Amino acid sequence: MLPVPRASRRRSRLALIASAIVASAALVLTGCSAGAPAGQSSTGGDTGAFPVTVKSALGSTTIDAKPKRIVTWGWGAQDIVLALGIIPVAMPKFTYSGTADGVLPWDAERITELGGKTPQLLTFDTGEVPFEEVVAAKPDVILAPYSGLTQTEFDTLSKVAPVVAYPEKPWSTSWRDQTAIVGKALGMTKQTDALVKKTEDSVSTLAAKYPVLKGKTFYYAAANEPGKLNVYRADDPRVQLLNDLGLKNSPSVAALDSSKGDGSFFYQLSYEKLSQIDTDLLVMYFDKQSSVDAFTSDPLVAAMPAVKEGRLAAIVGESLVMATSAPSVLSIPWSLDRYVPVLAAAAEKVK
């Protein structure tokens, strides 16, 4: 099951370690070398862009000089940094969908292309920021534009290095905005603009090969809990990627949303309300085929028109699920050729 990013954190622990972090950070940064670590590429870009200020929902961050030691947190930021030809000094460890070492496949391929080594991997499964591990990485900047950082975490990390958080809500930054934010923070806006354009072109080209998708409605959900669906709202990046491919959000997504305004990127729907879903495609992710079979064997699920008529687009496999759940300029090209045919096969069944 794809881990759902956690909005809540254990705040008491922060209070206990905050002062220790400040002291440790001061010692670490005082002794920090200005050179990039072995295996890390030069950031290049426009050194004249600094100082630069990046605004976020948690506060403005000023970066005085071009960062050389980059730490990423959350989803996607490490993809963007790697796509720019830079290997972060530390990034999250992904036990779901990652390699044996905890590196996402497209990141592992890119690190190999760059001739580098796997960076320090940060404990990520708990959803809590591993502050001591971040301090040990000696960052010049911490990039977390697609994350669930709390205000307390942001403030604590800001004592270690400048922190770049999300512009509006946690876990809701589009892949385009993530890329632009990272580009600004690193003084590489020309490069990130080019990455966005290249990615948009690849999406448009593939969408044109599957005109059956254009204008079809979809309802994106996940069966992460017994008897309930997690339904992804319009501002979720995985939903926006389907919009890029020409699909339209089903009116059912908003019509069945009884918890609007709660600040989350998804809401829960009971199986008792499945019959109220009206959509061309039902798009869902699963870790393996047996999970698909278990889901569709439920009588309430089996009775859904989209399931009965083969209009369920089941995205199967942890790596493909992660790549399309956290789309980026690196994961989108890696996944599209596997993703779009599944969507098109379901769209062909629409009468």
Predicted regions: what they are:
Residues 60, 152-226, 325-351:
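Extracytoplasmic substrate-binding proteins
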Residues 78-131:
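A short, structured surface patch at a secondary-structure boundary
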Residues 1-30:
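Sec-dependent bacterial lipoprotein signal peptides
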Residues 278-351:
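Structured C-terminal subdomain patch of bacterial secreted/periplasmic proteins
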Residues 28-48:
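Bacterial lipoprotein signal-peptidase II cleavage site
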Residues 58, 122-130, 261-270:
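Short helix-initiation/N-cap motifs at beta->coil->alpha
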Residues 131, 138-144, 162, 274, ...:
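Proline-aspartate-enriched helix->loop->beta-strand connector
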Residues 232-265:
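Alpha-helical, coiled-coil/dimerization segments enriched in small aliphatic residues
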